[in-house]
Curated annotation (Swiss-Prot):
Species: Homo sapiens
UniProt modified residues of type Phosphoserine: S13, S120, S377
Protein name: Hsp90 co-chaperone Cdc37
Positions of post-translational N6-acetyllysine modification: K78, K154
Disulfide bond residue pairs: none
Length: 378
């Protein structure tokens, strides 16, 4: 049975519509049509604004995801990573809101009555080109790392050559001859290389490689927006950038400067992290038999005891200890033993626990420990 309900709400008029004798029928139809067209145009305008807002939100989400990935590759700071993750979460929330509004707009459009302007539409008004389907599942972290390692081992020399280019024509020609370089692995390698150069204080070279890094990232972003393989669209990037489009060029330069600042920040964090690790290793090497750092123990000693270590005078140290409060003297000397600043003799090691020294009896009779790096033991 045919369902005729679809024709229940059709906003059309014909010559048999009854009108008042004093009203010009043609003018009435013309006014109705004009009002209907204006409503349709307003609706279309609102729909386009929603669509534009949704696309812009998706672009921001993609940009935030790119920065997050770049930060993870560069082993950036935790605070910056948390900030970007929070921003990405907020953007995804906004994206869902835009999509919901668009869906409501589509439902509203379907429920609108048909009219003479919408009863028929073009059947074919454009050509369709097959594109590579988007990946539904991302590779695991281990797979990505192995893929990156294999790619770098095979093409590291070519990637570095591309990183040293500067002219647009040279870069385009080199990528045309080596299209396998147009990929995410190349961009990741260039990012890490930039940070390494900044750590080595090769600032001018870092800025050169940073330029090529942004070139590759712009190509990848263009491919993502067009939903095609980057190797199929890198020439479009060079065509666009070489036409001296002011707005596009300003966007490129702004992103380049922002990227260089991020590289400097990552390099600074890496240096600070390396220094902390080095200091911790050196501290562990210095630890005495009781697990204390001799440098820290030395700095915590009273000034009169520090002077004894400075001049490496055992008798002077014993005299200073004998003049101190027995409890304080025992505390400081035990810390010196635990840190390795002092090595007690056999007599001292056999002393009963808790025994206090008298005014003329030093707490410990010690011998100097040789080979201390800080030269604070005697």
């Amino acid at each position: 049975m045919v369902d005729y309900s679809v024709w229940d709400h059709i906003e059309v008029s014909d010559d048999e519509d009854e009108t008042h004798p004093n009203i010009d029928t043609a003018s009435l139809f013309r006014w109705r049509h004009q009002a209907r067209v204006e409503r349709m145009e307003q609706f279309q305008k609102e729909k386009e604004e929603l669509d534009r807002g949704c696309r812009e939100c998706k672009r921001k989400v993609a940009e935030c995801q790119r920065k997050l990935k770049e930060l993870e590759v560069a082993e950036g700071g935790k605070a910056e990573l948390e900030r970007l993750q929070a921003e990405a979460q907020q953007l995804r929330k906004e994206e869902r809101s835009w999509e919901q509004k668009l869906e409501e707009m589509r439902k509203k459009e379907k429920s609108m009555p048909w009219n003479v302007d919408t009863l028929s539409k073009d059947g074919f008004s454009k050509s369709m080109v097959n594109t590579k389907p988007e990946k539904t599942e991302e590779d695991s972290e281990e797979v990505r790392e192995q893929k990156h390692k294999t790619f770098v081992e095979k093409y590291e020399k070519q990637i570095k050559h591309f990183g040293m280019l500067r002219r647009w024509d040279d870069s385009q020609k080199y990528l045309s001859d080596n299209v396998h370089l147009v990929c995410e692995e190349t961009a990741n390698y260039l990012v890490i290389w930039c940070i390494d150069l900044e750590v080595e204080e090769k600032c001018a070279l870092m800025e050169q490689v940073a330029h090529q890094t942004i070139v590759m990232q712009f190509i990848l972003e263009l491919a993502k927006s067009l939903k095609v393989d980057p190797r199929a669209c890198f020439r479009q990037f060079f065509t666009k950038i070489k036409t001296a489009d002011r707005q596009y060029m300003e966007g490129f330069n702004d992103e380049l400067e922002a990227f260089k600042e991020r590289v400097r920040g990552r390099a600074k964090l890496r240096i600070e992290k390396a220094m902390k690790e080095y200091e911790e290793e050196e501290r562990k090497k210095r630890l005495g038999p009781g697990g204390l750092d001799p440098v820290e123990v030395y700095e915590s000693l009273p000034e009169e005891l520090q002077k004894c270590f400075d001049v490496k005078d055992v008798q002077m140290l014993q005299d200073a200890i004998s003049k101190m409060d027995p409890t304080d003297a025992k505390y400081h000397m035990q810390r010196c033993i635990d840190s390795g600043l002092w090595v007690p003799n056999s007599k001292a090691s056999e002393a009963k626990e808790g025994e206090e020294a008298g005014p003329g009896d030093p707490l410990l009779e010690a011998v100097p420990k040789t080979g201390d790096e800080k030269d604070v033991s005697v």
